[in-house]
Amino acid sequence: VSSETLPFEPSTTRSGPRRRSRAESMRDSLQFPLLVWLAHFLITQISATLAYRFGEFRTVEYEPTWTTFVPAWGPDSSAYGMVREPLTGWQHWLVEPFRNWDGTWYSLVAEGSYSEGLSATAAFFPLYPWLMQLLSDITGLPVETSGWIISHLAFLGGLIMAYKLIRMDFSEKIARWSLVALAVFPTAFFFSAVYTESLFLFLSVTTLWAARKNDWLLAVIMCFFATMTRSAGIMLGAPLAVLFIQQHGWDLKRWFPKALLALVPPMGLVIFGWFLTTKDLGFLGWQEQQWQWNRFSAHPGRTFQCVFQGCEETVRGFGGPYEATVHPVSFRWLEELIDNPRWSFITSTEFRYMVGQSQVLDVLVTILAFVLILIGLKKLPLFYSFWVIPPMIVPLLAPSSVFPLMSMPRFVLPLLPLFVMAVLLLQNRRRLAIGLATVSGILLFLLTNQFALWYWVA
């Protein structure tokens, strides 16, 4: 284990110093996450608002061969091409830049649009849009604004609970730097967007914090809600199983009746499946509708072959199966930049679009994540490894013909152990850590700008 790992809880007494220590610990567990949350809010919000005020929406896209550009308007990429109405007042500048891409899907669902005629909505799990709808009904705010508020509050809660969980196994320094690493990660703007990343982070971290404390009732309740938020919620069963066995051993007699609580989290999938059947979308509609994102079945080796070499795959379309060309990772944007390094080109919609479509970010993040996983097998608590391995493997079994590693830079965000492992590697390299955090923060600012103007990021 790491030298920063705490092998046991510090002993305390019943005297005044113990109470002060607890008070100080409580204050620190709130103050530092709040500071990190505020810094993240300022970076992402300033970038998004400036982009919306002074930038222009994407105006091009590739034609099918990916060799030339054709005119296209960014907002047309919204759910079913249904361009959302502009928000008014402060919401136009603060919220509207963060409702793009999947944000339009969640807004559509929040307005009650699970239906056979809009079958792709079945792919979006219900807890987040239901909360959007509930808050909108209470406050009278648009559903997008409700989602924006929920995401920010959930991210603050996620940071607080992440700090508490990390401190159970590591030092204060590791906990603090892990929060910083998470908040300034280049794609961390999704925590501010009308997406499920913040809510899922809060629920998954709270699930494992409760299990780590042997509070299994709270753990399974939080896991149930996580499963109602994203399909990856059911994968929390792996780290929960590790913690349960570590706490109760292999004697089956010691497992019961607590082991019966394991029936609670899967009920999230059962309830959602049943709900979809009432909308004529099928019990497994959330999985069956993945074809609308051009996903196909493959083993991880085939997925990476498509990433680096390109491939041909049969995918389902609205008119039936067809052969799709899967384009490999591209450095065309770099070649173009070397040939034309002028500022006018760097800020052009063509260059920014090429960067977004290149898949370079997908590849770098995926490789980095697996490197951290391998190192973490020796340096992290066992349940940390079981926390991150399943949600990293499953997307490799269902790549998209658009981008084989589509959304991986977003999928890693709630996987807290990856950030803890990165901090452990950098803990004795302060200058390098500060430099990387600075570069990451700059990339966060730039990618937030990209997202706000309808360029693809993850």
Model-flagged regions — what are they?
Residues 97-141:
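Short hydrophobic/aromatic helix or loop-helix immediately within or flanking a transmembrane segment
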Residues 193-199, 408:
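Short acidic/glycine- and proline-prone juxtamembrane loop motifs at membrane-interface regions
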Residues 161-164, 181-184, 199-218, 418:
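Specific aromatic-rich, kink-prone transmembrane helix
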Residues 142-146, 162-184, 202, 381-382, ...:
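Transmembrane-helix signature of polytopic, membrane-embedded enzymes
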Residues 133-137, 146-169, 368-375:
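Transmembrane-helix motifs of polytopic, lipid-linked glycan transferases
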Residues 43-62, 98, 237-368, 372-375, ...:
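Membrane-lumen/periplasm interface segments of specific transmembrane helices
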Residues 183, 187-190, 204-209, 217-244, ...:
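Membrane-interface alpha helices of multi-pass inner-membrane proteins
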Residues 170-172, 207-218, 248-250, 426:
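Membrane-interface transmembrane helices that cradle and orient dolichyl/undecaprenyl
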